[in-house]
Structures are given as structure tokens and as C-alpha cells.
Amino acid sequence: MQGCQRSRVENMSSSGNVHVEVAVDSLDVEALRGALDLTGCGSVVTFVGVTRDVADGVEVKRLEFDAWEEQLPGVLADLGEQACAQFGVHSVALAHRTGVVLAGEPIVAIHVASPHRAEGFAACAWLIDELKAQAPLWKREVRVDGAVWKAGLG
């Protein structure tokens, strides 16, 4: 990604029309979108997940993500390639944060470029569901009343 300023991207890989990043310090949603190949596309569908500031009526200070760092980029890339094949989309760019993510900050970003919107929306929804089910990530929610590990792989 030319001209892209990032705060320490830990792992980055591109395979065909799939671009994956694992970001430690920040996630630049718009710069990630620039990794898409828009050839022949009339649609870009985007999902951005952010740390909520309140959960179950209690203030959330931050999330802390732990990852199997050697495996995470490959899992994300495999999901992107599956989405391209299964839904007929042209290009996928996805990124996930690790470490500390404060309330309001992006955790995950998924961009899907496709000829038409229907397959883009379907692929994007499938990607976030599969990422949550398959990615080797664990999440600790730190709230004003304590901390709790949330469901994750493993």
C-alpha cells in the first residue's frame, strides 16, 4: 500500500485480490479500503466494528485482544479467498486489531468490492460471522466494574 502511514502493522499479506492486515496500534479504515482492486466493480461494501462504550449498562474502558499471531493472518486470508470464491466478489481487504482498543476505536474493518451490491453485502456479512467463529482471537472486556474474558476461539 503506497503512501500509507501506519502505526506498526504487525502482519500484512496480499494474495491475489485479498489483502489482510493485523494491526497493533491503530487501524486506518480508509487506507485499508485503498488496498481493494476495483476493476469491474460497481460496489464497495464496508463493515467496521468498534469498541462500544457501554455494555449491559456498564461503562467499557477498553478491550484487550490476544491473538495467535502466527496463525491469524493466514486465517484472515483464507476467509477472504473463500468469500471471493463463494460469493463471486472481486476483491477483499480486511484488518483486525490486537492489543488494547479503546472505546470508539475500530477493532475490525472489512471492505468487499464486487460488480453488484447483493454479493458484496452477502460476502461482508459472511466474513464477519466467519471471522468471529474462526479467527484465533480472544477478547478481554475491561469495564468500570472489573474485567471479563468474552467468548473467543479456543
Predicted regions and their residues:
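N-terminal, polar/charged subdomain of small-to-medium soluble alpha/beta proteins
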Residues: 2-4, 8-107, 113-154
